[in-house]
Amino acid sequence: MRIGVIAIQGDVSEHVESLERALAERGATAEIVNIKHKGIVPTCDGLVFPGGESTTLGRLILREGIDAEIKDAKEQGIPIMGTCAGLILTAKAGDSQVEKTHQHLLGLMDIKVNRNAFGRQFQSFEVGLEISFLDSPYNAVFIRAPAITEAGEGVKVLASIDGKIVAAEQDNVLAFAFHPELTDDMRVHQYFLDKLFN
């Protein structure tokens, strides 16, 4: 089992540590590799897109030629998880802010995103979030977070705040507007690992 973390930019080490902890919790093992260039994605059984600066992340993925490999992985049913900026990358469409920056989107999910959904006044916040696959609230850390403004028919909404969708799933792709790698609660990473091991 091999999990690839897009390591071009963003919260890479935090995701690696969280995945290692989540694997240890379930008594499972997997190799975790950093993806910085073409050729690694096709060797992976699961992919993680970390938070970071979405415009930079998208541009570098395109430049390195990783985008086509990611789309192929999606078509093959490889589990994929995007968090914060990673959520933006999974989208099919974005708001005017996304368009203005010529943000490269991978179109893995039938969703439209608002890049800075919670406004400048909420640079970051934490909230006890009700997520459909969890039986108790999850302490979600939001940092200049995006949100999903439109979700297509095949998209399952997992969590919302004030009418804004902040977690969703479509087929083998998971998208979270918050940073699960910044908490001690491994349940979101476990949900991703469930897709790999089941």
UniProtKB/Swiss-Prot annotation:
GO molecular function: glutaminase activity; pyridoxal 5'-phosphate synthase (glutamine hydrolysing) activity
Active-site residue list: C84, H179, E181
GO CC terms, sorted: cytosol; glutaminase complex
InterPro entries the record matches: Class_I_gatase-like (IPR029062), PdxT/SNO (IPR002161), PdxT/SNO_CS (IPR021196)
EC nos: 4.3.3.6, 3.5.1.2
Binding positions for L-glutamine per the UniProt entry: G52, E53, S54, R115, I143, R144
SUPFAM superfamilies (alphabetical): Class I glutamine amidotransferase-like
Reaction catalysis annotation: aldehydo-D-ribose 5-phosphate + D-glyceraldehyde 3-phosphate + L-glutamine = pyridoxal 5'-phosphate + L-glutamate + phosphate + 3 H2O + H(+); L-glutamine + H2O = L-glutamate + NH4(+)
Keyword Hydrolase: yes
Keywords, alphabetical: Glutamine amidotransferase, Hydrolase, Lyase, Pyridoxal phosphate
Pathway entry: Cofactor biosynthesis; pyridoxal 5'-phosphate biosynthesis
The keyword Calcium appears for this protein: no
GO biological process, one term: pyridoxine metabolic process
SS bonds (residue pairs): none
PANTHER family: PYRIDOXAL 5'-PHOSPHATE SYNTHASE SUBUNIT SNO, PYRIDOXAL 5'-PHOSPHATE SYNTHASE SUBUNIT SNO1-RELATED
Cited function: Catalyzes the hydrolysis of glutamine to glutamate and ammonia as part of the biosynthesis of pyridoxal 5'-phosphate. The resulting ammonia molecule is channeled to the active site of PdxS.
Protein family according to the UniProt entry: Belongs to the glutaminase PdxT/SNO family.
HAMAP family assigned to the protein according to its UniProt record, in alphabetical order: PdxT (MF_01615)
Subunit structure: In the presence of PdxS, forms a dodecamer of heterodimers. Only shows activity in the heterodimer.
Identification of the protein by name: Pyridoxal 5'-phosphate synthase subunit PdxT
Organism: Methanococcoides burtonii (strain DSM 6242 / NBRC 107633 / OCM 468 / ACE-M)
